């Protein structure tokens, strides 16, 4: 068993070294170049038309019987991103790579804002209607419909189904079980069974119930956690400037061994920052597009904007605030505090009454919503590979069993499995994103000309088959040419 653990750890270190740095940063930078930095140039517009509409009655908050609203889609996706990656993941990055890892997490987040925008936009443009008249989409659909690469789509789905067992089930149940154990002292085996029962109750209702659940829980848990974080940062206000400076300098000249910190090389700092960066926002994995493809939206770009905001909220906002609390506490170099407890210990130091409880409760809620949301992604991967209800039921059972196993597992080994699985999803997904960048540019130009500031809406029932496929089949489209929307009603 130890040999297997060592092999997984070595493979994780290799994949999230130079290979993923190249794929994630260069691939994302290429998309920024191809889209002429559309996300950054239009960030104000994106913010006002996404989060700015959450509390208003608008197309962002409405859905029909067969779909979910954009807000429910982003809540489901955020439920899959705001979890162990934002709390335990950030602590792990700092513990292993030093404070400088957060700088590389920022770089990954800025690049990934466009990456996630791109994959969600393409997922909506290539989505289909299933036998229940519900939208289905994701990387497997733009790999097949957009590029006619069904073999690569199947490969992504296989990698995805395996990865989700680690990222969704093992990691999140591990984080949730440890949080409950910290609060109550209840045996981990009992906690695992309780997690399993609660999860079954939610996932049996499908994407509609998952979306409704996430829409209620995500805002609540975000306010709870961020509220406590802001209070602590006010307490540490005189240290914030030096903490931010430390993050930047440590990114290029990592801290040598000090206290309980073993020291880190530049590559270690980059590796842990990027790995935790992608785990905190999912960009490039191809998972979130599966939820967004089910949204009630009139245009792919309009839904893609929610993806950019997801990355900003989960990585730039939540991860940074968590990191500042940890660094200001000074506990990151304490050998007696492991990564699993680092964030809770930092909160407890600043808020002796209730600090650790807030982190444990927040992590419990974060992890459970992630656990539920990622089952949906896994089911979508299996559904693409086979229509067999028996196989889907078996996968559901395995996912549930893994949630019990994860509640008993060691943290480092669980993270290593997840890192390897995530890498196997990234590669085929980026092949699709790069090769379909021309179609992505067309979709942006179509949105800019016909919908962005015109007040017009597209058709909420447009799919790849009845509208967007006409774009993807024009192999010799000139980038400067903008097509008028096709009218299929006349």
Model segments located where?
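Extracellular/periplasmic helix-exit of transmembrane alpha-helices
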Residues: 117-127, 230-246, 254, 258-261, ...
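Transmembrane alpha-helical segments of multi-pass small-molecule transport proteins
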Residues: 21-26, 152-161, 182-207, 223-225, ...
